[in-house]
Amino acid sequence: MEASGSSSQSQDSGGVHRETEDHYQETELHKHHGKARERYKRDKSSSSSSSSSSSSSSSSSSSSSSSDSSDEDQPSRGPRKHRRRPRRDSLRGADHGELEVLKDELQLCGGAAGEMVPTGESGLRRRGSGSAEGEVEASQLRRLNIKKDDEFFHFVLLCFAIGALLVCYHYYADWFMSLGVGLLTFASLETIGIYFGLVYRIHSVLQGFIPLLQKFRLPGFRRTN
């Protein structure tokens, strides 16, 4: 009886010990699971905070770069506007000047029918004559440089006529015939000279001889009135 009682007590004590060990293991497992969950939550929160901080830093950097670019663009745009303004002012001034010139020309053209009217290219022409005829005549006069009242031209032609008169009198000894030849020579040279522009040619030839005459002129010689 005593042996059976001791064996039953030992079995009861062993069962209790096993139950305590199982309970202890379960509690440790629960602790490990709780710690693992806490670590996972901490890691997740830290990763979310780092991502939010990185996004905020990127947004701040982008905003700063955009503000810098806007600050740089503003001074660069300013001078361009200031540069464009003088061009517009110059164009307006040119248009205003052209309008004033046109007004002056209209005022000059508003005279009587027989007045001299200035034109842009053809020089002076008489109002009432055709514009095409005036331009042609002015261009011909400018090209030939003809002056019908040129005293030097008439003097040269008169010299030719006198020379022809003297030669004719030397050969024929008749003053009437000599005067006729001289007058014909003078008239023919006048018409030919006016028509073909001999005035300009004679002037050009004499102007070519003027430098030679100046070279041969004595340095101490002066003209006296």
UniProtKB/Swiss-Prot annotation:
Question: What's this protein's name?
Answer: Transmembrane protein 40
Topology in the membrane? Multi-pass membrane protein
List the Pfam families: TMEM40
- Keyword annotations from UniProtKB, A to Z: Acetylation, Membrane, Phosphoprotein, Transmembrane, Transmembrane helix
Bias (Basic residues) occurs at 30-39, 78-87
Coarse class of the primary localization is membrane
| Ranges for region Disordered | 1-96
Q: Using the record's annotations, give every residue carrying the modification N-acetylmethionine.
A: M1
A GO cellular component annotation here is:
membrane
Question: Where does this protein reside within or beyond the cell?
Answer: Membrane
Residues modified as Phosphoserine = S129
The regions listed as transmembrane in this protein's record are: 152-172, 179-199
- Biased composition (Low complexity) is annotated at 1-14, 46-68
Q: Where is the composition biased (Basic and acidic residues)?
A: 15-29
